[in-house]
C-alpha cells in the first residue's frame, strides 16, 4: 500500500519520501528503524543524541542510544514476560528478552503461562506475551489455562498495564498467529495499553523477533532510564554475547552432520517406509537431552526444481540473492536449498498477483473468496500455481520478494547422548501421496529416503524442548504413548533411563498397521523388557484384526492399572499426530480418570489439568 495524504498523517512531500525509502530498506534496516522510532518520541525532550548510520548500528548499540536519549525520564523498572510454547521457540525468545532487560537493570518475571500466578496479573506494570499458535488456531499446551483465564469473567481489569505481543506461527496454516492475535485483542479489551505493535512471525522468525525485541526494549529504556545508561548498555552487550556464545552452531548457523547410517525400519512387504538416521555430532560441541528435537534443513526435489525452471524458461545458472547480506547462488541452487516451493500460502499468492496476468488469481485472493483460496492452496505447490495462472512476468530476480525461505523440519530425537556419545538419531517416515493429478512428496522425508547416503552431510541444529522432558527423578514411573514415529522420543527416554540405572516403572503403548512389518524398534523394546528397563509394553496393530484397534483402546482396556499408576505419581507423555491420535488419547485419559477415579466429567478435566500444570502430562504433538 502506498502512503497518501488521505490515508496517513503525512504531508504529500513526506509521503513521497517515505514511499521512495521503504522499498529500498533491508530487513535489518527496517528492524533498526522500528526500534529507533519506538524510543525516539519519548527521548525528544532529553538531550540530543548523535545517531550513526543505520547500517552501522547493532541492536545493542540501539539500546544504548535509547538509554542515553531517555536519561531525563524515570518510570517503572519491572517487567513480566509470559510465554506459551509447544516446541520451545517462544520460550527461547522470551529468555532472550529477559536477558536484555535484566542487563539494563530491570526486575524481570519470566514464566510459562501455566506456571504464572494469575492473581499477580493486575500488578504487572509491563507485560510482554510471546506465544505460538498450535494446530488449528489453538494455544500451546502450556498456554491453555492462562488463555482460558484471560478470556473468562475472572480476568481483572488491566488499566495500569502496558503490553506488547510477539506471535509465532506458520502462514501455511489458516489460523496464522491466531493465539497471539487473541491475546493482543483481549489485553486491549481489559484496558491494557499497547506500547509496541504486535509482530506476527512466520516460520523464518528470527529477524522479525529481533526487531520486536529491539522495539520493546527501546520503549522501556525510553520510559525508565537506568542510572548509568552507558554502563547498562555494556552489560546488555555482555549479556547478549553470553547468550550467543552458548553454541557455535544454531538455527542460523547449522552444523554439517555426517550421515553414519540410513536404515529402513519397516519390513519387506510394508506399504510404509520409515528411515532411522544416525548422524555424527563429532567436533560440533552440540548436546541435547531426551525430549529435544533436531532441526533439519532439507533439499527440495531436483525434478520439481527443474520443472519450475523449465516452465518459466529461466537460466538455471542465473545469480539470485539468497541471504540477508546479499549473498547469491545460482538459481537452481537457490531453489534446491533456500526457497520453499512445495507449500502455497495466502501471502505467497497475494505477492504473485503482481507478476501474473491472470484475472482469476486476482479474484482468488480477495477477502470474500477466502474459502476458495483455502481449498486451492491445499495440496498444491508452486508448479501448480505457475501452470494455473498464466501468463507470468516473474523474473528469477523476483524470487526473494515472492517465495519464503525453506524452513527446517523438526524431528524428535530418538537417542540418548549418554548412550550414543557424539551421535544423534532420528526417525523419519516417508510421505508420498496423490493430489490434483500429481504425485506429491514430503520435502525432508523423501530427501532422507531417496537421496541421502552414509557419508553425506546434513545441515542440522538442536531445538531444545523444555516442555517435553522426562522426570528429574529417574525413579518416577512413566507412561509413554507413541504410535508410529511418535515412539521416537521414548527410545531416547528409555535409553537414558537405562544409562542412569532408573528404578522407576516404565510403560510404553505403541501402535502401527502391521505387527510383522511395522513394529518400529521392536528388538530394542524386547531387550529393554528383558532387562527390566521397560516394565510393560502394550501394542495395537490396526490392520491385523477385523476391527481396527488403536492405542487408546489399549489404554481403556488397562484403565484400572493406568489410573493406579497415576495415583502413584506417574508422568504421562504423548507423542505423534495431534488431530486424531492425541485428541483420542486425551479423551481416553478423561474416561479412565472419571471411571476409575470416581470423578464427574468436570472433575476428570480438573484432574488432568492439574497433571498438566505439575508437568506430569506432557505432549509433543504435530
Model regions: which residues?
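FNR-like FAD-binding dehydrogenase module
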Residues: 1-622
Amino acid at each position: 500500500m502506498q502512503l497518501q495524504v488521505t490515508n496517513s498523517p503525512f504531508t504529500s512531500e513526506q509521503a513521497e519520501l517515505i514511499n521512495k525509502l521503504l522499498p529500498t530498506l533491508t530487513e535489518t534496516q527496517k528492524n533498526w528503524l522500528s526500534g529507533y522510532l519506538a524510543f525516539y518520541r519519548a527521548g525528544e525532550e532529553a538531550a540530543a543524541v548523535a545517531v550513526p548510520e543505520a547500517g552501522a548500528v547493532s541492536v545493542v548499540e540501539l539500546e544504548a542510544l535509547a538509554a542515553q536519549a531517555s536519561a531525563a525520564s524515570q518510570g517503572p523498572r519491572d517487567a513480566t514476560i509470559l510465554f506459551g510454547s509447544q516446541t520451545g521457540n517462544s520460550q527461547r525468545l522470551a529468555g532472550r528478552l529477559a536477558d536484555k532487560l535484566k542487563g539494563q537493570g530491570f526486575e524481570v518475571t519470566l514464566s510459562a503461562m501455566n506456571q504464572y500466578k494469575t492473581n499477580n496479573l493486575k500488578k504487572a506494570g509491563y507485560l510482554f506475551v510471546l506465544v505460538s499458535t498450535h494446530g488449528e488456531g489453538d494455544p500451546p499446551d502450556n498456554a491453555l489455562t492462562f488463555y482460558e483465564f484471560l478470556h473468562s469473567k475472572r480476568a481483572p481489569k488491566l488499566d495500569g498495564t502496558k503490553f506488547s505481543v510477539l506471535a509465532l506461527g506458520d502462514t501455511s496454516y489458516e489460523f496464522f498467529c491466531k493465539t497471539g492475535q487473541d491475546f493482543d485483542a483481549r489485553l486491549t479489551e481489559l484496558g491494557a495499553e499497547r506500547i509496541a505493535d504486535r509482530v506476527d512471525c512466520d516460520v523464518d522468525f528470527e529477524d522479525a523477533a529481533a526487531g520486536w525485541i529491539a522495539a520493546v526494549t527501546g520503549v522501556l529504556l525510553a520510559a525508565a532510564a537506568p542510572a548509568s545508561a552507558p554502563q547498562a548498555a555494556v552489560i546488555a552487550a555482555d549479556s547478549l554475547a553470553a547468550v550467543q556464545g552458548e553454541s557455535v552452531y544454531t538455527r542460523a548457523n547449522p552444523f554439517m552432520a555426517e550421515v553414519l547410517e540410513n536404515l529402513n525400519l519397516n519390513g519387506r512387504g510394508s506399504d510404509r517406509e520409515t528411515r532411522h538416521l544416525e548422524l555424527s555430532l563429532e567436533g560440533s560441541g552440540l548436546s541435547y537431552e531426551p525430549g529435544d528435537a533436531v532441526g533439519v534443513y532439507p533439499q527440495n526435489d531436483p525434478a520439481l526444481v527443474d520443472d519450475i525452471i523449465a516452465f518459466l524458461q529461466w537460466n538455471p545458472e542465473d545469480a539470485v540473492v539468497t541471504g540477508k547480506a546479499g549473498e547469491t547462488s545460482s538459481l537452481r541452487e537457490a531453489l534446491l536449498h533456500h526457497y520453499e516451493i512445495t507449500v502455497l500460502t495466502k501471502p505467497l499468492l497475494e505477492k504473485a498477483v503482481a507478476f501474473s496476468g491472470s484475472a482469476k488469481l486476482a479474484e482468488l485472493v480477495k477477502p470474500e473468496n477466502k474459502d476458495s483460496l483455502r481449498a486451492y492452496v491445499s495440496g498444491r505447490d508452486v508448479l501448480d500455481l505457475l501452470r494455473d495462472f498464466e501468463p507470468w512476468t516473474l523474473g528469477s530476480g523476483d524470487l526473494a520478494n515472492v517465495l519464503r525461505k525453506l524452513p527446517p523440519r523438526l524431528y524428535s530425537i530418538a537417542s540418548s547422548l549418554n548412550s550414543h556419545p557424539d551421535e544423534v538419531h532420528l526417525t523419519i517416515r516417508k510421505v508420498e501421496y496423490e493430489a490434483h493429478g500429481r504425485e506429491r512428496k514430503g520435502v525432508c522425508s523423501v530427501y532422507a529416503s531417496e537421496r541421502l547416503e552414509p557419508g553425506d552431510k546434513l545441515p542440522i541444529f538442536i531445538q531444545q524442548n523444555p516442555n517435553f522432558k522426562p522426570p528429574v527423578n529417574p525413579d518416577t514411573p512413566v507412561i509413554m504413548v507413541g504410535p508410529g514415529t511418535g515412539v521416537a522420543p521414548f527410545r531416547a527416554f528409555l535409553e537414558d533411563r537405562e544409562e542412569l540405572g532408573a528404578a522407576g516403572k516404565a510403560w510404553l503403548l505403541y501402535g502401527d498397521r502391521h505387527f510383522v512389518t511395522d513394529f518400529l524398534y521392536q528388538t530394542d523394546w524386547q531387550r529393554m523388557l528383558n532387562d527390566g528397563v521397560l516394565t510393560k509394553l502394550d501394542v495395537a496393530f490396526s490392520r491385523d484384526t477385523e476391527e481396527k484397534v488403536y492405542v487408546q483402546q489399549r489404554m481403556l482396556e488397562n484403565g484400572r492399572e493406568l489410573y493406579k499408576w497415576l495415583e502413584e505419581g506417574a508422568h504421562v507423555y504423548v507423542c505423534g499426530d495431534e488431530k486424531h491420535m492425541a485428541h483420542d488419547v486425551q479423551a481416553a485419559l478423561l474416561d479412565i480418570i472419571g471411571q476409575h477415579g470416581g470423578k464427574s466429567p468436570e472433575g476428570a478435566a480438573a484432574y488432568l489439568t492439574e497433571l498438566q500444570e505439575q508437568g506430569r502430562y506432557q505432549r509433543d504433538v504435530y
